Amino acid sequence: MATQTVEDSSKPRPKRTGAGSLLKPLNSEYGKVAPGWGTTPFMGVAMALFAIFLSIILEIYNSSVLLDGILTN
C-alpha cells in the first residue's frame, strides 16, 4: 500500500486579511458554554411571538380574519 507524507511546510497557509483581523475577537469565545440556561427563555419567548406573528399573517392571507374597512380583490 503506497502512502505519501506531506510536510507541514508545504501546506498552504490561510491568507491574513484586514477583515479577518477585525473579526477575530468575535470568535474568541468559540466553544465556551455559559453555565445554566443562559438566554434560552428569551429565545423561547421570541420563537413563540414569531409563531403567533406567522399565524396571524397566514390567517390574513387565507381571509379567515375579517378586516373591516380594508378592501381586497
Swiss-Prot record:
The keyword Cytoplasm does not apply. Phosphorylation is a light-dependent reaction catalyzed by a membrane-bound kinase; phosphorylation occurs on Thr residue(s) in the N-terminus of the protein. The modification Phosphothreonine is found at T3, T5. One of its GO terms (biological process) is protein stabilization. Pfam families: PsbH. InterPro entries: PSII_PsbH (IPR001056), PSII_PsbH_sf (IPR036863). Signal peptide: none annotated. Keywords: Chloroplast, Membrane, Phosphoprotein, Photosynthesis, Photosystem II, Plastid, Thylakoid, Transmembrane, Transmembrane helix. The chain crosses the membrane at residues 41-61. One of its GO terms (cellular component) is chloroplast thylakoid membrane. GO terms for molecular function: phosphate ion binding. SUPFAM superfamilies: Photosystem II 10 kDa phosphoprotein PsbH (SSF161025). The keyword Nucleus does not apply. NCBIfam families: PRK02624.1. Belongs to the PsbH family. HAMAP family: PSII_PsbH. One of the components of the core complex of photosystem II (PSII), required for its stability and/or assembly. PSII is a light-driven water:plastoquinone oxidoreductase that uses light energy to abstract electrons from H(2)O, generating O(2) and a proton gradient subsequently used for ATP formation. It consists of a core antenna complex that captures photons, and an electron transfer chain that converts photonic excitation into a charge separation. This is Photosystem II reaction center protein H. The lineage of its organism: Eukaryota, Viridiplantae, Streptophyta, Embryophyta, Tracheophyta.
